[in-house]
Swiss-Prot record:
Keyword Magnesium among UniProt keywords: no
Gene behind this protein: s100pbp
Domain of life the protein comes from: Eukaryota
Feature: compositional bias, Polar residues: 299-309
Region (Disordered): 270-312, 356-385
Pfam families xref list: S100PBPR
Molecular function in Gene Ontology: calcium-dependent protein binding
Protein name: S100P-binding protein
Chain intervals with Acidic residues compositional bias: 270-280
UniProt feature, compositional bias: Pro residues: 365-378
Keywords of the record: Nucleus
Location(s) in or outside the cell: Nucleus
A GO cellular component entry from the record: nucleus
Length: 571
């Protein structure tokens, strides 16, 4: 490439320059090979002033805008969660774009109109799935419940629809028909009721043995879908289907394990179409029939049915739990074990008989028991306690054991004991049975820890005491042996012998002279320390100033300016 600069001689020197781009062949540039482009370069630093730049308008059309594909979900309710740029999706305008033959609006090769039609079809499919009538016919079951007069009446199980429809149906009707469901706005998918789930199922066998006119269906917290009644044209009122006295016994019997199995079978056999959304699947909870708040509310209500069940003598509560058959009445009654020692009292035979006489009027049958009522231990305590230990709480063992020992002395108890006192009586017997099974095994003597004796403390070594007579005797023996040794080796010409003889004689004759052997470490403390003296005193003792011993040393020390040169002496 070759660039030619055309500089203008103006006040702004070298401020405006034009660049001409030519072809690759510098010698013979061919016209038409490249488009002539004029570039204006402005250098404002020459003058420091701003100037307007005339820019050429871009005549070429703008490039095609890239459209980011936004995929909407199959249901309108989950669209805000799946598409983040819904507003941007509506702002795109492709009217100025020219569509080619091989070009489409989306990677799915579908136009915008087709996508909208597909979404509308999905919402209709989700709102009204096919097979709604068939599914409701197969899932809803009719239960035969005996009436007071012995006739049978068909009652349709209800569905628990956890939706805003519950608040709308809280009036006197408490029923929900198929027409009201179809009349709702099907376009608003979020406002629709979730998938139905069974809330309670009862069997006619349990109600038959109970002997009470209790209906298996009682729509309290959720509306009831009476489809068969709508077809017949006679919708029964909720007050006729069930009354307030049958609420607790009916719903409490729906918490049984047998009912849960029926719920699982119905939920597995149901043919509910899947519309591609998991919001409906998350609401399916057949196992959780009722919430904990409903259970607490039901047990707290004082109804005739629950009061009759609580008045059952609790002496047979243990045997009833063991010999209970599937055909017997299964109604969970919650009791609270009393941990107060004062409430742990025995029941006599007369009191138990009186309580049984009062309960004979109840319609709840008691299972047969071979043993007489009262605080009697079973024949096989170990086998009986294996079942008791699973139910008995651990915190009442110590208190109940002491209460049983005190209860053996008492032979009568008042008849106005509460239910909690009777429960304490029964649980106390169970604990005693479990205690009787345990055999106390004494630890063997081999396992007992033997106390060992501590080792004797070593006594401090004392210095041996030698008498003076014995010491003198040993000294003489040692000296005689040394002298004998010297006499044997007595040679006059030996220099060591002569030196030793001289030192011995000198030390004996001159007491001021000390033997060299006394200067050893053994006799060092015997020497007299010399008296310290000053330097002048030491000079006077050693000859005085007449001795020219320190002649030449200066009175004051002067450092030599050069090393190796001694300072000059005094003149």
């Amino acid at each position: 490439m070759k660039a030619a600069y055309d500089c203008r001689a103006t006040k702004r020197a070298c401020s405006d320059r034009k660049v001409l781009i030519l072809g690759t062949n510098w010698a013979n540039p061919q016209s038409g090979t490249m488009e002539k482009i004029t570039i204006s370069i402005v250098n404002d630093k020459a003058t420091g002033n701003k100037r307007n730049i005339e820019e050429e308008a871009d005549e070429s059309p703008p490039p095609k805008k890239l459209r980011s594909a936004v995929f909407l979900c199959s249901t309108p309710s989950s669209a805000p969660h799946c598409s983040r740029d819904v507003d941007v999706f509506d702002e795109f305008d492709d009217t100025i774009l020219e569509r080619s033959e091989d070009e489409s609006d989306s990677p799915l090769h579908m136009t915008l109109v087709q996508i909208e039609e597909l979404l509308e079809g999905d919402s209709d499919y989700a709102a009204e799935p096919p097979g709604w009538e068939e599914e409701s016919d197969t899932v809803l079951q009719e239960l035969a419940v005996p009436n007071a007069d012995g006739s049978q009446r068909n009652i349709v199980e209800f569905r628990n629809l956890n939706s805003p429809l519950v608040e709308e149906q809280s009036d006197s009707s408490h029923t929900l028909t198929e027409e009201t469901v179809c009349s709702q706005d099907t376009s608003n998918y979020a406002a629709m009721a979730p998938s139905p789930c069974w809330s309670s199922i009862s069997t006619a066998e349990q109600n038959g043995e109970a002997g009470d006119n209790v209906l298996s269906v009682c729509p309290i917290t959720s509306p009831v879908l009476h489809k068969n009644e709508v077809n017949r044209g006679s919708v029964q009122d909720c007050s006729e289907v069930c009354n307030d006295s049958d609420i607790c016994s009916t719903l409490s019997s729906s918490h049984l394990p047998g009912d849960l199995k029926v719920v699982d079978e119905i939920s597995e056999d149901s043919d509910i179409p899947f519309d591609g959304d998991i919001d409906e699947l998350l609401t399916l909870s057949p196992g959780d029939t009722t919430s904990e708040d409903e259970d607490n509310k039901i047990t707290s209500e004082s109804t005739p049915a629950s009061s009759e069940l609580e008045s059952v003598p609790l002496v047979h509560s243990h045997t009833e739990a063991i010999y209970k058959t599937p055909s017997s009445l299964q109604c969970p009654v919650t009791f609270t074990a009393s941990t107060d020692p004062s409430n742990l009292s025995q029941l006599s035979v007369s009191s138990v008989t009186a309580i049984n006489g009062q309960n004979n009027s109840n319609k709840v049958p008691l299972p047969p028991s071979d043993t007489a009522p009262g605080p009697q231990l079973p024949a096989d305590p170990c086998s009986q306690s294996s079942k008791v230990l699973k139910v008995e709480p651990k915190e009442n063992k110590v208190i109940k054991e002491t209460g049983f020992e005190q209860g053996e002395k008492s032979c009568a108890a008042p008849l106005d004991h509460t239910v909690k006192e009777n429960l304490g009586q029964t649980s106390k017997e169970q604990v005693v049975v479990s205690i009787g099974c345990k055999k106390k095994v004494k630890p063997s003597q081999l396992q007992q820890k033997k106390l060992g004796t501590l080792p004797t403390k070593p006594q401090a070594a004392c210095r041996p005491q030698i008498s003076n007579a014995e010491l003198e005797k040993n000294r003489n023996i040692y000296r005689d042996r040394v002298m004998m040794h010297l006499e044997v080796h007595n040679i006059p010409g030996e220099p060591n012998y002569e030196l030793a003889t001289l030192l011995n004689e000198t030390s004996r004759e001159n007491p001021t002279w000390q033997h060299p052997s006394d200067y050893t470490r053994r006799n060092y403390y015997v020497r007299k320390q010399p008296v310290p003296c000053s330097l002048n005193d030491w000079v006077m003792r050693n000859g005085g100033p007449a001795i020219e011993r320190f002649h030449g040393l200066p009175c004051t020390f002067q450092r030599s300016p050069m090393p190796g040169v001694l300072p000059t002496g005094p003149s």
